[in-house]
Amino acid sequence: MDRLDDTDERILAELAEHARATFAEIGHKVSLSAPAVKRRVDRMLESGVIKGFTTVVDRNALGWNTEAYVQIFCHGRIAPDQLRAAWVNIPEVVSAATVTGTSDAILHVLAHDMRHLEAALERIRSSADVERSESTVVLSNLIDRMPP
């Protein structure tokens, strides 16, 4: 798909803000008919711009009250695919990325409490060639949003 135009971006912004809005409601906001909005949304779905629709649930309501960012330092060099394979089946790891700097990767980890976090960290450290890790526990989230 070519670069999104301003109208596509406005449609995406409306969907991000009001996911349950009808095509007619979105069309009213972006000055298009409901069928025109539907065509654009369908095109963005087919091209992979929109990856799907989901429900966002407050993690605290599900008991995931402890959050940490974990820097991972590995022995020697390790391929990103190996790191992904080591952590993809650990449900507490909600995101993982390779990074620049002294660490090899950073993980975003959720847990029910500190004991659960400690158990998750043990599984994380034992599942790859990890030399050491440094964890930073989140006290409060100040900003949590999607990009504009």
From Swiss-Prot:
Induction: 6-fold up-regulated in presence of arginine. Changing residue 101 to T: Increases DNA binding affinity by forming high order protein-DNA complexes while decreasing ligand binding. The DNA-binding activity of Rv2324 is modulated by interaction of Rv2324 with amino acids. Aspartate is the only effector amino acid that completely abolishes DNA binding. The majority of amino acids induce a dimer-tetramer or dimer-hexamer oligomeric transition. In response to amino-acid binding, adopts an open quaternary association, which is a part of the functional requirement to bind to non-symmetrically distributed target DNA binding sites. It comes from the Bacteria. Disruption phenotype: Down-regulation in strain H37Ra reduces growth and lowers M.tuberculosis survival inside resting and IFN-gamma-activated macrophages. Residues 23-42 bind DNA. InterPro entries: AsnC-type_HTH_dom (IPR000485), Dimeric_a/b-barrel (IPR011008), Tscrpt_reg_AsnC-like (IPR019888), Tscrpt_reg_AsnC/Lrp_C (IPR019887), WH-like_DNA-bd_sf (IPR036388), WH_DNA-bd_sf (IPR036390). Residues 4-65 form the HTH asnC-type domain. PROSITE patterns: HTH_ASNC_2 (PS50956). One of its GO terms (molecular function) is sequence-specific DNA binding. Keywords: DNA-binding, Transcription, Transcription regulation. GO terms for biological process: response to amino acid. GO terms for cellular component: cytosol. Contains an N-terminal DNA-binding domain, followed by a linker and a C-terminal effector-binding domain, which is also involved in oligomeric interactions. Homodimer. Forms oligomers. Transcriptional regulator involved in growth, DNA replication and damage control. Plays a crucial role in regulating survival and growth of M.tuberculosis. Could function as a global regulator in both the latent/persistent and active phases of growth. Binds to its own promoter region and to promoters of multiple metabolic genes, such as serB2, lat, ald and roc operon. In vitro, interacts with intrinsically curved and non-curved DNA molecules, and with both supercoiled and linear DNA, with higher affinity for supercoiled DNA. Binds to DNA recombination, replication and repair intermediates. This is HTH-type transcriptional regulator Rv2324. It comes from Mycobacterium tuberculosis (strain ATCC 25618 / H37Rv).
